[in-house]
Amino acid sequence: MADVNQILRVYGKHLQKNVRLKALAEKAWSYEDAHKFADEAAGLLCDVLKMYMDPATVTYDDAVRIFEAAMQKNYSEVTKVCAKVQRDMYRKAGVGLNALTPEFNAEKARGIAQVITDAEEVTDDYMRNLVKNNALGVVDDMIRINSEASENVGLYVHIVRKYDDVGLHNGKDVCQWCMEREGEWDNYQEALAAGAFERHPGCGCVIDYHVGKTHTWSNTKGAWNDV
């Protein structure tokens, strides 16, 4: 039986010792940086899970215990970085709002446990796609709830989804499903309706957003235009 506490301890040590992740956590200034952090932190978690859990023999109940605890730890690390990004974003926009944090979704963790225990074979890539998808979903949820909240108080938002040729896309044909969701929106509801926050397992698309008091975002300047 896998020791959940041991998994969490080792994962925590891996996070502390990883120079690149520490730098990303400290210097992240955009949700794209948060995306990179979530992706790499999830990769570390997969390495630890591989050390202590055998997908071929783990029971559903044990898998639930492992994934709920591991995903919650990952969620905590990712939301800390996202909250920093959001606070900096509000500070630069000159508004005194607090960053909102989505609740931990234990149902997703249980869903991964179900998929793992039901699968006839679980490859390393398959596991990584599931775990990374969950981690990137936390970043997406941070963007979703904060962009909606910003818009609700009269601020202007600019949401971007960029296609990224990684994960299941790597070495394969262009993913039409993701291409249909790529774009830029100046309205949260339009981005939501366009599927900007949706992912499939292995999806590496990058979602970012900006907030400001003016109504037009300049990609060239990387700043809001004065009006």
Residue spans of the language-model regions?
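Domain-core detector
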Residues: 1-200, 208-227
